[in-house]
Curated annotation (Swiss-Prot):
Expressed in which tissues: Expressed at low level in many tissues.
Main localisation: secreted
Region (Disordered): 238-273
Subcellular location: Secreted
Descriptive protein name: von Willebrand factor A domain-containing protein 7
N-terminal signal peptide: 1-28
Alphabetized UniProt keyword annotations: Glycoprotein, Secreted, Signal
Glycosylation site positions: N55
Length: 891
């Protein structure tokens, strides 16, 4: 890669040509899509972050051709809107989704937005280059980039994305909050990312920088054309005489002489006195963001950089293994499946990007083994053997919690055991953690709940002893499969099948009644449709839309291939499957479990948010689940809408979502979806009234629409959602932890639905000392409480290790209020750990700044927020080390 500090004039002709071809003129900007405030045409932090990431990703694809695929040509993108779905389909092939990339980029963008929303961050001038804290801001910026590198090298990519979001926010704020653009600069500051380089010509304490401005727009209020300064915001720190304010409606300092301000956050003079320079500031901020991404790519290398942004359609492979003496067959089955996956997928687009292994053997569990090297994973797995013992129950949920802590989002976790959990008290917390991590958990249990033989037992066990597994599987969108030793190797084949990125098709009705038919829809964008059934099944029939039926006879039938392994059945339909309504009928003792899955290029992400119209940066406040008493916005982003699909078959249109009670499947309501912005984005929104949702009833989301030819389209999110009774926020320090340190944490809890008497419990993994000044909260309607926690990191803490802090708010006594959890992930960094950014990176790949002021629009730029400009009002999910609420996120 060329040195990041090399000016554009030093870039070679081929690179300049590349830049000219990729970047369209400014007129191609997408406008703001939310009309919460009047700032049309503003460019947001999310816009800048995602456009820069797409530019650098495309350059990586151009420079590193995929083996076996046609080389991408930059000319193919001349004059076109750059879409993540398009470049992924071109690079990996049709049918390979950009979903993981978009989800990872969403993590970065939400962490970016957190800097403007969270109380611990939004008022700190060092994090925003405010109050002439330019040197301190640069220290924070460089520190966040270093921490991004450290976390990525420790394979903690979630934390790395959070620190990257914080770094990009500060970097982008520099160009909006300082007067760099007013000084006539149109390129990024050449020294801002290099800590040993001086920031020249800084305004000093006694230097007046602004004149008084009475109006909203203040184009000529800068006094000196050579000194670098930034504006003061609010009353802390107080603005000295003669200094500039940030400005805008919510800045109290802007009413004190000299009045006005210099921020370029938006196109609205109500919020940005230098609004006329907004686009110029955005253009330079985009160049700087591309420079930062390119720097990380050069430091990490292409493989690790791709993992940082999840530039892959593949998931991770995560095993939780019971290693007691009776588990020999199960361990061998796990080894066989892991070996098969490694051998079949190595070097392909679906090669797992990450491998996680957690053994458990009562009374212990762990340690966790994580690697990105398949050979190392196989070697470690091959060392595991059944260790003797065999008392039931086991510490399964503790091991699963450890796996969830280290498994990347949007992954499958497979638990092999023949015992019930000894640590069933962790059930609710693990359920919540699966939602927070968006991981699907499948239990393969070689134990019949009614069987009495087998392991030794310390006491008589309840027939409901496996219910914790059922609850966790249901909450995560997974399943519990009971089988026997002789079938485990065949049943374990679902490990590889599930990792193919399958979607679950909605059934009507969702819960099977023996003897009653159940239907599901197949559309032309589905393939490898598979029906899985397990239970005491005596017979079944599957009927296609053409009226062709297939029964339980094993082998290849008129519809597909039927296989049976004890009480576990699979029917894989012959491709291409007939489109239309299919019917299943099952005869069984008890309630059979039926699941229909398929591969598809069309899927969706969804998130929640609430409107916030006060504060310095109004917008949509991100939530991971609805909150009781609050009007919630549901935001849907359809993935897999490539340009080719739109031209050939017409663009799919989704009209509404259906909310169903879980697990009964009864319909709670149907909510219309409204398109937001241009159709090319596939962005839809709906308002969920508080009366529609209940704290006591989890619900599922089903997306309903039509394809280009009028066929029915239905997609369902596998993880059910729940409504939080209170808003619970947990935030940590802006920096990483170090051994021997004591870190302050902040807790905030609010009730919007009425009186709440809550007990607050805390836990830490690993078991570090944690103290809190808030153990109970009695809240009335719209009342809040604040708490302070102190986390002590021992001198013996392992560097590059993850610490997870959990706070649980539960109703007191016999209260029926379900608990709400907040999770905070932190990284312990050795005091000597440094990844210096002391000089430019040297590599063969080009940086991708434009030769003319412009931004590259993309489908990922879906969050234009009115009135915020670059204020970072992304509207969904977990942000910057903080989980607002544990609950429903997209699968």
């Amino acid at each position: 890669m060329l040195p990041v500090e090399v000016p554009l004039s030093h870039l070679g002709p081929p690179i300049l040509l590349l830049l000219q071809l990729l970047l369209p003129p400014t007129s191609a900007f997408f406008p703001n899509i939310w009309s919460l405030l009047a700032a049309p045409g503003s460019v947001t932090h999310q816009d800048l972050t995602e456009e820069a990431a797409l530019n650098v990703t495309l350059v990586l694809f151009l420079e590193q051709p995929h083996p076996g695929r046609p080389r991408l040509h930059v000319e193919d993108y001349r004059g076109r809107t750059l879409l993540a779905d398009d470049i992924f389909a071109a690079y990996f092939g049709p049918g390979f989704s950009s979903r993981r990339f978009r989800a990872a980029l969403g993590e970065v963008s939400r962490a970016n937005a957190a800097q403007d929303f969270l109380p611990a961050f939004k008022s700190n001038p060092d994090l925003h280059f405010d109050a002439e804290r330019l040197v301190q801001g640069r220290t924070r910026l460089v520190g966040a980039l270093r921490e991004t590198l450290v976390a990525a090298r420790a394979l903690e990519y979630t934390l790395a994305r959070q620190r990257l979001g914080a770094a990009l926010h500060a970097l982008q704020d520099f160009y909006s909050h300082s007067n760099w653009v007013e000084l006539g600069e149109r390129q990024p500051h050449p020294h801002l990312l290099w800590p040993r380089q001086e920031l020249w010509s800084l305004a000093q304490v006694g230097d007046p920088t602004c004149s008084d401005c009475e109006g909203l727009s203040c184009p000529g209020n800068m006094l000196d054309s050579t000194l670098l300064t930034s504006g003061y915001f609010g009353m802390h720190p107080p603005k000295p005489p003669g200094k500039c304010s940030h400005g805008g409606h919510f800045d109290q300092s802007s009413s004190q002489p000299p009045r006005g301000g210099i921020n370029k956050d938006s196109t609205s003079p109500s919020f940005s006195p230098h609004h006329k320079l907004h686009l110029q500031a955005a253009e330079v901020a985009l160049l700087a963001s591309i420079e930062a991404f390119s720097l990380l790519r050069s430091r990490l290398g292409d493989k690790a950089f791709s993992r940082l942004l999840d530039i892959t359609p593949a998931s991770s492979l995560s095993f939780v293994l019971d290693t007691t003496g009776s588990m020999g067959e199960e361990i061998n089955a796990a080894k066989i499946q892991a070996r098969r996956i490694v051998e079949q997928r190595q070097g392909s687009p679906m090669e797992p990007v990450f491998y996680i292994l957690v053994p458990f053997h009562d009374p212990g569990f762990g340690p966790v083994f994580t690697t990105s090297d398949p050979d190392s994973f196989w070697q470690k797995l091959n060392e595991i053997h059944a260790l003797g013992g065999g008392d039931e129950p086991e510490m399964c949920l503790s091991a699963l919690e450890l796996a969830l802590l280290h498994t990347p989002p949007l992954s499958d976790i497979f638990v092999f055991t023949d015992a019930s959990p000894k640590d069933a008290l962790l059930t609710n917390r693990v359920e919540s953690l699966t939602r927070e991590r968006r991981c699907r958990v499948t239990f393969l249990v070689t134990e019949d709940p009614s069987r009495t033989g087998g392991r030794r037992r310390r006491e008589a066990l309840s027939p409901l002893r496996f219910e914790p597994y059922e609850a966790i599987a249901r909450a995560s969108g997974g399943e519990v499969i009971f089988t026997k030793d002789q079938y485990i190797q065949d049943v374990a084949a679902i490990v590889g099948e599930s990792m193919a990125g399958l979607v679950t098709l909605p059934l009507d009705p969702p819960v099977f009644t023996p003897g009653e038919p159940c239907v599901f829809s197949v559309d032309s964008l589905l393939w490898q449709v598979t029906v899985r059934m397990h239970g005491d099944i005596s017979s079944f029939w599957i009927k296609s839309p053409a009226g062709v039926s297939q029964g339980p006879e094993e082998g290849i039938g008129p519809l597909g291939h039927t296989r049976r392994f004890g009480q576990f059945w699979t029917v894989t339909m012959t491709d291409p499957p007939r489109t239309g309504t299919w019917e299943i009928q099952v005869a069984a003792a008890g309630t059979p479990r039926v699941r229909v899955q398929a591969q598809t290029s069309l899927d969706f992400l969804f998130h929640f948010g609430i409107s916030v119209e006060d504060g310095p940066h109004p917008g949509l406040y991100p939530l991971t689940q609805p909150v009781a008493g609050l009007q919630t916005q549901l935001l849907v982003e359809v993935t897999g809408l490539t340009s080719r699909q739109k031209l050939v078959g017409g663009q799919p249109q989704f009209s509404h979502v259906v909310l169903r009670r879980v697990p009964e499947g009864t319909q709670l309501g149907r909510v219309s979806l409204e398109p937001v912005g241009p159709p090319v984005r596939g962005l839809l929104a709906a308002s969920l009234p508080p009366t529609l949702l209940s704290v006591s009833s989890p619900f599922s989301l089903e997306l309903v629409g039509q394809g280009g030819g009028g066929e029915s389209l239905r997609r369902t999110a596998p993880q059910p959602c729940s409504v939080a009774p209170v808003l619970l926020e947990l935030s940590g320090p802006p920096d990483f932890l170090t051994p021997g340190s004591k870190a302050p944490l902040s807790l905030h809890i609010v009730s919007f639905s009425g009186p709440q008497d809550l007990d607050l419990r805390t836990s830490v993994n690993p078991s570090f000392s944690l103290t809190s000044n808030l153990s109970r909260a009695r809240l009335g309607l719209n009342e809040s409480a604040w708490g302070r926690l102190w986390l002590e990191v021992p001198d013996s803490a392992a560097p590059d290790s993850v610490v997870m802090v959990t706070v649980t708010a539960a109703g007191q006594g016999a209260s029926q209020v379900p608990p709400t959890h907040a999770f905070l992930r932190l990284l312990v960094l050795a005091q000597s750990s440094k990844d210096q950014l002391d000089g430019p990176a040297h590599s063969a790949a080009p940086v991708l700044p434009p030769v003319s002021p412009a931004l590259l629009p993309s489908t990922l730029v879906t969050q234009g927020r009115a009135g915020g400009g670059m204020a970072g009002k992304a509207w969904w999910g977990t942000v910057g080390g903080v989980l607002f609420l544990l609950g429903c996120t997209s699968w």
